UniProtKB/Swiss-Prot annotation:
Keyword Hydrolase attached: no
Lineage: Bacteria, Pseudomonadati, Pseudomonadota, Gammaproteobacteria, Enterobacterales
Topology relative to the membrane: Multi-pass membrane protein
GO CC annotation, single: plasma membrane
Keyword flag Ion transport: no
Species this chain originates from: Escherichia coli (strain K12)
Major location (coarse): membrane
Compartments, record wording: Cell inner membrane
Protein name: Uncharacterized transporter YfbS
GO molecular function annotation: monoatomic cation transmembrane transporter activity
GO BP term (any one): potassium ion transport
InterPro entries in alphabetical order: Cit_transptr-like_dom (IPR004680), DASS-Related_Transporters (IPR051679), Na/sul_symport_CS (IPR031312), RCK_C (IPR006037), RCK_C_sf (IPR036721)
Length: 610
């Protein structure tokens, strides 16, 4: 063992210890590695910074942007809402659908992001079903990890291994090369969790969050006595409202009808359009109306204006919470609007929002509020577009936002662009499948289109990239080059050959899986893939077999981080909400990791012959 190899292995040991202790940020450790290699002269400057020019680093950054675009447009949130409706109160159905949904979404966006989105969904469902969240949180994390086995772009380790294949002059994996293995693991994972979830006792009730919690739409509806006031009315052809401006119709004065928004068909889908005083109505528009006057004859109103009552699900537009927001505001002492009524202020025209409730001295006022003077200390309930509510809250000149309901966390800043986001995702996958356009270029095209369609803006795009992950990959890549230059890879391959080389390639697959899984207990799965990929390819070359089975087993083992709560950020996320201990992950993670290893040893040679 030469001096340079001892230096590289020592540096690797230091990095692993720092990763394992968690006292130093992982990206800081990666930068330390870059500096150490550059100053020691072990690698040339181009070799040290080769990670920054790696196409897969660009691809990973682009995938962060695409994933955030799916979040901002509400695609993931809508999936969560659908999941709750379909599963009902069945724990088995919820577990199966949860794992299928998370694995499906995680195949195209960050598994950590998907799991973060579904944690509040799972907590809500657990509370409603009066079951322990621990029975669903572990399946959630397992599904997030399994999603990394569903497509080539699902997780950075897959791309790292693919990059090593390309660097060695081989063809890379196709987009769905890993999918058959992932599907089998997913099915086994669902069956495994259906049986083993009973080992996760947890608390019988969902742990309550400490301190102040936000109220919900339902709380505000009850406090301001809004029950029974909401209506959905469709404008029939020939209605006198067609082509008329809202202010000219005087609906509030004549019928006590306050138009909150309009459902309108736009590009083959129904969207909710915000309204103001100059908004004009069209045939077949569906009006979302707050009827503040209890004595108004709804039948007469519909007859005179040729309106057709429509079904309204949920209480007071709660089913439209992704588009229609609600907030409590109050006048500030310096406001010039104190003493003026809603009508005098021109509230809807000025702010694009509707005043539907007013509390004075803790008591909600009833009836029409349009001519009620607003006093200092009044709490005003406004309804309208979430974006406009946010603008009013930030304005700070006349009003201060007192309370935004819990549903604000589900609102998506670009909800109306969800079809465009899905189109961009499908286009990216299609371009990757053609093999005519490089994967990073296909991802960048999708990012540009998301920007064009306003699924995401430039500032949000840069913020969505998880730069510590990018720096970690870039900083660990020089290790692969250094181990090859100094003979470290050859030494590792010799050790593997001594252990399992005489028993054939199947045994070597098992050895590579075990080694990758063990290393993954101490460092991130991405760093594991960076270190193990060159060793796997060198082992294949030594044995005279195809490199693809060995490369694939490293990618799969890197995603099989089921054994400890620190093996992956996905596990760490559910640790608290699930009220788990370290032993919970060990007793469920170790057996399932062995199952995944068995699947890989059997299936990989079938898909990628030696």
């Amino acid at each position: 063992m030469n001096g340079e190899l001892i230096w590289v292995l020592s540096l690797l040991a230091v990095a692993i210890v720092l990763f394992a202790t968690g006292r130093v940020r992982m990206d800081a450790v990666a930068l330390f590695v870059i500096v150490a290699f550059a100053l020691s002269g072990t690698l040339t400057v181009p070799e040290v910074f080769s990670g920054f020019s790696d196409p897969n680093v660009v691809l990973i950054a682009a995938l962060f942007i695409i994933g955030d675009g799916l979040v901002r447009t509400g695609v993931a949130t809508v999936m969560g809402t659908w999941l709750v409706k379909v599963a009902g109160n069945s724990e088995i159905k919820m577990l199966v659908l949860l794992m299928l949904t998370v694995a499906g979404l995680g195949a195209f966006m960050s598994s950590t992001g998907v799991v973060a989105i579904f944690i509040p969904v799972v907590l809500s469902v657990a509370m409603r079903m009066q079951t322990s969240p621990s029975r669903l949180m572990m399946p959630l994390s397992f599904a997030g990890l399994i999603s990394g086995m569903m497509t080539l772009v699902a997780t950075p380790p897959n791309l790292v291994v693919n990059s090593e294949l390309l660097r060695e002059g081989y063809h890379g994996f196709s987009f769905f090369s890993v999918t058959p293995i992932g599907l089998v693991v997913l099915v086994l994972g669902i069956l495994y969790m259906l049986v083993m979830r009973f080992m996760l006792k947890g608390d019988t009730q969902t742990p309550q969050r400490e301190g102040w919690t936000r109220r919900t739409f339902r709380d505000l509806i009850r406090e301001y006595r809004l029950t029974g006031r909401a209506r959905r009315l469709a404008i029939r052809p020939g209605s006198p409202m067609i082509g008329q401006r809202l202010d000219d119709l005087k609906l509030r004065e004549r019928y006590g009808a306050n138009v909150i928004g309009v459902e309108r068909w736009r590009r083959f889908r129904r969207v909710i359009v915000n309204v103001n005083g100059v908004s004009e109505f069209r045939a077949r528009d569906v009006l979302l109306i707050d009827m503040s006057a209890a004595d108004v004859d709804l039948r007469q109103f519909c007859s005179e204006q040729l309106l057709e009552p429509m079904v309204l699900r949920g209480e007071y537009f709660s089913d439209q919470a992704l588009d229609v927001g609600m907030a409590e505001i109050s006048l500030i002492p310096e406001s010039e609007l104190i003493g003026k009524s809603v009508r005098e202020i021109g509230f809807r025209t000025r702010y694009g929002l509707n005043v539907v409730g007013l509390k004075r001295n803790g008591v909600a006022l009833e009836g029409s509020l349009a001519d009620e003077p607003l006093l200092l200390g009044d709490i005003i309930l406004v309804v309208g577009n979430w974006k406009l509510i946010g603008m009013l809250a930030k304005q700070g000149r006349d009003f201060v936002a007192l309370n935004l309901p819990e549903e604000v966390s589900e609102a998506s800043p670009a909800h109306s662009q969800a079809p465009h986001a899905i189109f961009c995702l499908v286009l990216m996958v299609a371009l990757m499948l053609t093999d005519e356009i490089p994967n990073p270029v296909a991802a960048i095209i999708a990012c540009l289109l998301m920007g064009k369609f306003r699924c995401i803006d430039a500032e949000s795009a840069y913020k969505s990239i998880h730069w510590p992950s990018i720096i970690l990959i870039v900083g660990m890549m020089p290790f692969a080059v250094a181990l090859q230059k100094t003979g470290g890879v050859a030494l590792a391959v010799k050790g593997l050959m001594d252990i399992g080389g005489g028993y054939g390639p199947h045994m070597m697959l098992g050895c590579l899986f075990v080694l990758s899984a063990v290393i993954g207990l101490f460092i991130s799965n991405t760093a594991t893939a960076v270190l193990m990929a060159p060793i796997a390819l060198a082992a294949a070359k030594t044995m005279g077999v195809s490199p693809y089975p060995f490369a694939m087993v490293v990618a799969m083992a890197a995603s099989a981080a089921f054994m400890t709560p620190v093996s992956s950020p996905v596990n760490t996320l559910v640790l608290g909400p699930g009220n788990y201990s370290f032993s919970d992950f060990v007793k469920l993670g170790v057996p399932f990791t062995i199952i995944v290893m068995a699947v890989c040893v059997v299936m990989i040679p079938m898909l990628f012959p030696f």
